[in-house]
């Protein structure tokens, strides 16, 4: 009877440096203005939101001055006091989003951002309803600023509320100069672990150490000769005759290699650059904006062919179908 206290000999891919890169991707850096300047979407939305807030600020100051209590016989015009709270709240909201984007931590705080944006949208729309029909120019200008800010807020809610793999967001991020080295690290963290040897836990609390390298999600059975020292299935051990080992089994020719298909009916564009794992001969490298031919779009890894005829598998969330 074998002991359950032995060590496990993991495949070499378990200690792959790419897994360390996936873990280190959560260690956020400081504020980098390049994340704002190099991202057209972030630069445009933060600029418009800041301009809208400035319009609201000056409109609120003059609108509060122009309010009338009706003592002089003029119509009663009262400034809504909660608009001051909305003004201050949106200031910290815009500042917080600016810091989050500049520090490249949107995926860490995106849930909180969407919640705060929803609160800001309610306050902005309520202020619009109370100011736009006042008949006072300063209050109407304030309402116009809130309308512009509400439009940006709705866009932000859609952007931060969508997954990085969503087609609209992936298309927007493809124009950013800095997302190439930051977004895939987080977005591919779980799939990179699956590819490098960590998939779902089994009944013994351990992990299946075989990467998914088939383009269609199906892969041939693999034979392992490393000793697991106690992680084997006892039920299967009783069915194996004595003297029988994996060394006596003839290994199929070309095991681990994927036969490339002959038809590639799909075309996809790379939204990020990808460097193939040197330990996996089935992967291919490609650069950002490169167009690949795809044979099958099912599964996490697609069988692809480059323009130079090189074939292999590519991660699906680095590509967008054309």
UniProtKB/Swiss-Prot annotation:
Q: According to Swiss-Prot or TrEMBL, what is its membrane topology?
A: Multi-pass membrane protein
Looking up CDD domains in the UniProt record yields:
SH3_Sho1p
Q: Which UniProt keywords apply?
A: Cell membrane, Membrane, SH3 domain, Stress response, Transmembrane, Transmembrane helix
Region labeled Disordered — which residues? 1-20, 191-261
Biased segments, Polar residues type = 1-16, 191-250
Q: Give Gene Ontology CC terms.
A: plasma membrane
Q: Which residues lie on this side of the membrane: Cytoplasmic?
A: 1-40, 103-107, 162-322
* Residue intervals passing through the bilayer: 41-61, 82-102, 108-128, 141-161
**Locations listed in the record:** Cell membrane
Q: Which intervals hold domain SH3?
A: 263-322
Q: Name one GO biological process term.
A: regulation of actin filament polymerization
Name the source's superkingdom: Eukaryota
Q: Which residues lie on this side of the membrane: Extracellular?
A: 62-81, 129-140
Family of the protein in this entry: Belongs to the SHO1 family.
Q: How does it assemble?
A: Forms homooligomers.
What is this protein for, i.e. what is its function? Plasma membrane osmosensor that activates the high osmolarity glycerol (HOG) MAPK signaling pathway in response to high osmolarity.
Protein's recorded name: High osmolarity signaling protein sho1
Instruction: Give the species.
Output: Neurospora crassa (strain ATCC 24698 / 74-OR23-1A / CBS 708.71 / DSM 1257 / FGSC 987)
